Amino acid sequence: MATVNKQAIAAAFGRAAAHYEQHADLQRQSADALLAMLPQRKYTHVLDAGCGPGWMSRHWRERHAQVTALDLSPPMLVQARQKDAADHYLAGDIESLPLATATFDLAWSNLAVQWCGNLSTALRELYRVVRPKGVVAFTTLVQGSLPELHQAWQAVDERPHANRFLPPDEIEQSLNGVHYQHHIQPITLWFDDALSAMRSLKGIGATHLHEGRDPRILTRSQLQRLQLAWPQQQGRYPLTYHLFLGVIARE
């Protein structure tokens, strides 16, 4: 696992908080796919772990659940609170949840655990706070995501410009000893140009790099090279994510 600077991650998402939802197409599509995998029953107590601005917290609250919205980023929780998205708001780390054991019917975490330093620890914590017969439902990104971004940057420099995500077999190793179902699904978003595609990453706070960031500003010539190197289809610029969707049944 890469060393993870939680303060830097929280700061990156904090900067994106006010404009997060307008860039959150990936999160919405991912949530819809995970909802389709969930056992169809009533969930009365829900943890939204990595809640962001509270879109899914509001979804569960509208279905009459008692919702706890948890996020590493205080500005994200401010956005969630302004929307009256949850019943309780909690600043906290998924790898060390400040919550009692066996509290929730559902621990929901959509595109958050990829920011954790140790996936096994994060999943164990989500499992811990779920009651017997409850469910942990999560999505994360897997190796092979953002191939267009990686390809385009190779025309400019050799530095990493997006995090490397775990391969599916390593994610499954983190699920050893529990009953789970999983599915891997690609999602491709389309943009008018390469800059818009990259701005979508910044707009959801996903520009933090575990290895550190090159502070230099992108020059006009670099942007032109990126634009030319980015694979296109009919004049549109794709950005592809590979999702791992998992549903764990608590015994």
UniProtKB/Swiss-Prot annotation:
Reactions it catalyzes: malonyl-[ACP] + S-adenosyl-L-methionine = malonyl-[ACP] methyl ester + S-adenosyl-L-homocysteine
Keyword check for Transmembrane: no
Recorded family membership: Belongs to the methyltransferase superfamily.
UniProt organism field: Escherichia coli (strain K12)
Name listed for the protein in its UniProt record: Malonyl-[acyl-carrier protein] O-methyltransferase
Highest taxon listed in the record's lineage: Bacteria
EC number, UniProt record: 2.1.1.197
Cysteine pairs bridged by disulfides in the record: none
Keyword Methyltransferase (UniProt): yes
Pathway(s) this gene product operates in, as recorded in its UniProt entry: Cofactor biosynthesis; biotin biosynthesis
